[in-house]
Amino acid sequence: ASHPEFDTLFGAVSISNEHSDMARALISECMLESFQAEQKFLNNVEPVAPLSVSAKVWSREMLATLCHVPLVNKLVGCCDPGKALPILLRHYLSLNGKFVCFSVNKAFNDSLDGLILVDLSKVPEKYMKRYLGAEGLENYQKHWKNQVQADNDSA
């Protein structure tokens, strides 16, 4: 809220190694198929330690039809009974987060970390208000309205 000039947030979301490699591969590939960041971000980042899984039971074509959050959640439960998509991952998706890549994090108990970007201009207003507060949201909106106006004036 104190820096309305920033419009993109990034960070990691972890998928615990308590999920099987098959479930983690399914999650990561579905996220990259349906919720992938823009190409300009993909060109500059690559995973340090990609998750390697053999004998996948899906094709890329299947992923395009499978990748709806409730369905992926059910499939994860089929791979790993009692497990589901991590809550934080689902939350970032509700903010319209986009994934850049996934990498196994050896320093964090072999979790599978996804690099995610959140474009604040695409976050639903109810979440912006929750996280920034009414005044912070107003400042953010005012800043970007002025920025767009300045860009239009200079064009």
Predicted regions span which residues?
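Short, low-complexity, polar/charged sequence segments that are solvent-exposed and flexible
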Residues: 28-32, 118-122, 133-139
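Acyl-donor binding region in acyl/amide transferases
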Residues: 1-113
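Short, intrinsically disordered/low-complexity patches at protein termini
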Residues: 33-34, 123-125, 149-151
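Short, basic, helix/turn surface patches
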Residues: 36-44, 124-138
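C-terminal "cap" of GNAT-fold acetyltransferases
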Residues: 110-124
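Short, highly charged low-complexity linear segments
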Residues: 53-58, 131-132, 151
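Composition- and surface-driven signal marking solvent-exposed, interaction-prone regions
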Residues: 103-105, 115, 128-132
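Short, cationic low-complexity segments
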Residues: 135-155
